[in-house]
């Protein structure tokens, strides 16, 4: 039996008519897929997380000891419903690099709940690659508790057909001189719909902190729906927060350029739709992950 649950809540509500305060989905009892605990400092861990039943739930706990770096790749293979909860614990002067790659079935529903806590000078680098199959709901909550803690996120997505891509990312600055940088980029085709909520919250006591967020969206169809919600909250005076969004279409000059080289409009759209994910893949600096991403792109486009 399914219940209706509310996920991806904005920390501060806005007008209900905008439809971005939270998202309601149908979800029920899920099979327990167990828990992974990772503390392998200085190494790269690779997890293949597969949900083959009606619904499955997986827990991943990542701990970076003081002064150490932990790198984890999660490949997420949802057949129907899959919830992956990943918790990051970053001690002083440590770093976690988490790369999440969606490789799901067409009619699947993938939920990502990713959270993190950073001590003094602790760092989190989050990379999410959402490859255009199935519905995706991603919720990230990160706490920069220690002075000098930092968070960066690179998110690349493709939405097509009747797909839903629904994202919520919240970074809370508690410590002094903390930093955050959020970059999201993607393309929407056919009748896809997407929400991106990005919140940077400067708490009282976070003096000297800096945060920025930027999203770039390419809209490739009259039926697509895009909602971009950048939000900066501030309870501290001596901080710097920036946000921006670039939303555009494939213009006639660009189409003419492609067509003059024998590339059809449909092929040109696919090339441009791939661009954000290909660019993000190059930053991963891991040949196996890059090859998997590019191979999946070839299948979906």
Annotated model-derived regions:
Residues 1-46, 52:
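Long, low-complexity, mixed-charge
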């Amino acid at each position: 039996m399914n219940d209706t649950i509310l996920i991806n809540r904005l920390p501060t509500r806005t007008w209900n008519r905008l439809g971005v305060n939270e998202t309601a989905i149908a979800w029920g009892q899920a099979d327990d897929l167990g828990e992974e605990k990772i503390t392998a400092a200085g190494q790269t861990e690779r997890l293949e997380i597969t949900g083959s039943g009606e619904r499955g739930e997986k827990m991943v706990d990542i701990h970076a000891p003081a002064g150490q770096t932990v790198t984890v790749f999660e490949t997420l293979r949802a057949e129907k419903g899959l919830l992956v909860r990943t918790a990051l614990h970053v001690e002083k002067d440590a770093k976690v690099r988490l790369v999440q790659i969606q490789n799901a079935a067409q009619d699947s529903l993938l939920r990502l709940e990713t959270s993190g806590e950073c001590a003094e000078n602790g760092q989190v680098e989050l990379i999410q690659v959402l490859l255009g199959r199935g519905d995706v709901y991603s919720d990230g909550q990160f706490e920069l508790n220690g002075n000098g803690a930092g968070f960066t996120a690179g998110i690349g997505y493709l939405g097509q057909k009747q797909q839903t891509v629904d994202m919520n990312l919240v970074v809370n600055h508690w410590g002094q001189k903390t930093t955050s940088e959020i970059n999201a980029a993607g393309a929407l085709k056919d009748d896809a719909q997407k929400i991106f909520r990005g919140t940077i919250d400067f708490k009282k006591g976070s003096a000297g902190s800096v945060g920025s967020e930027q999203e770039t969206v390419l809209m490739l169809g009259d039926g697509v729906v895009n909602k971009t919600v950048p939000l900066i909250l501030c309870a501290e005076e001596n901080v710097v927060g920036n946000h921006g969004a670039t939303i555009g279409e494939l213009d006639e000059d660009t189409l003419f350029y492609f067509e003059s080289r024998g590339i059809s409009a449909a092929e040109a759209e696919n090339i441009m739709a791939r661009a954000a994910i290909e660019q993000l893949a190059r930053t991963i600096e891991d040949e196996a992950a890059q090859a998997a991403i590019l191979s999946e792109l070839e299948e979906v486009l």
